[in-house]
Amino acid sequence: MRPLPPTLRENRRYILIKVEAGEITQKDIYRAVADSVRDLFGDVGASRIHPAVVWSEGEYAIVRCSRGHELEMTAALACVTKAGGSPAVFRTVKTSGTVLGAKKGISVKKRYLHED
């Protein structure tokens, strides 16, 4: 079966988050995000939002969701209190239409922090 052309694929948004927690894995981040989305919006809402963690490195991670559900996703991220058994806070840094655009938020954030 051939893949769908780009015009027929579902559009997605990528949210760059800063993870303020101890040492946690990408799997722990996904579980915390999925549980938070399910708790806030139920199974039907979670199926509409399609949460996924596509990248994590150090204190940053990129979470994917369906276009049009960015606000619900950021609300769910703000409600996370635990990840991997330890206290955690997920702070939204940037929302973008591509992974590369979301990653650019890391360098911009660091540039502003180091200008002092």
Language-model segment annotations:
Residues 9-54, 93, 102, 106, ...:
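Surface-exposed, low-hydrophobicity interaction/linker segments
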